Amino acid sequence: MNAIEIRNLTKRFGEKLAVNELNMTVPVGSIYGFIGENGSGKSTTEKMICGLLIPSSGSIKLFDKDYTDPSIRDGVACLIEAPGCFKSYTVWNNLMLQATNLGIKNKEEEVRRVLKLVRMEGAASNKYKNCSLGMKQRVGIAMALLGKPKLLVLDEPINGLDADGMRIVREILIDLTTNHGCTVIISSHILGELEKIATHYGIIRQGKMIREMTAEELESNCPIYIALKTKDMNKTKLVLSSKYNRVEEDESGYLRVYDLVSTEEVVTFLYDNGIIVNEIMTDKISLEEYYINLMDKKEVR
């Protein structure tokens, strides 16, 4: 069973087509990285999934039920834009107020549970206005987790966070999907962070889904390569191309060898041809580079 199945989803705002016959499949228990440029339709799609916007056409199924089914709506939570917190209230009081609004029984127990999940047990008495940006994001996630949702939709939850803040959010999301039966959709422009946690990806452009893939499929499309520099790069490229199948120059001025060979073999081969290597390393194509290459090549019709 899939957590989300979207077919031919369209949303218009007057003459503007924000989402254009979009298809999306999100497996249960996955962390789905939703990627796209500003204005590509990510937030609009997320708001329709969460019931905050009504589609112009198309269908949304959540756990095999129509997204409007009351029996499934309580299992969907989101953090889109800033959490609705009272600045002068403590973290505890904000969460208690939200638990009351949701009609949750045993509110104190539930608030303690979500505070533990987001690692903020020791910050419950802090006023929200005095929290760091990273802590405020975790308060927002805690509010979304009240009531034990099965599906959590997060829009740019790590923007503006420092490295430690991003690490904590990463660990929280992995814990939610691994140990608490939650499925997570997360959109972010920080693709290096998404690559560390996502199990599935969807890439949207101009309101259309142009690529969906698993982390394993991404890995197979992001090969390892050897990058190197010499004093005479033109000669080096000619020499390397005489032996290896795929040799390319990148934007940083490095030559890349994509054949499955060792750095030692490449250095020896070049030395035997009178070329000394100044720099050499092994690397792989990142999600960010894959995405940029895809955007350059893909034409949406």
Each PLM stretch: what is its role?
Residues S71, E219, K237-L240:
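Short loop/helix-cap segments at secondary-structure boundaries that form the rim of catalytic
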Residues M1-T10, K297-R301:
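ABC-family P-loop ATPase nucleotide-binding domain
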Residues K150, G181, A198, P223, ...:
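Residue-level detector of structured alpha->beta connecting loops
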Residues K208-K229:
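Conserved beta-strand-loop-alpha-helix hinge in the C-terminal portion
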Residues I224-L294, R301:
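Short, charged/small-residue-rich alpha-helical element at the C-terminal edge
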Residues R73, L218-N221, E248-E249:
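Short, flexible turn/loop "capping" segments at secondary-structure junctions
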Residues V28, V91, A215, K284-L287:
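Structural motif detector for alpha-helix initiation sites
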Residues I4, K11-I186, L191-R205, M209-R211:
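ABC transporter nucleotide-binding domains
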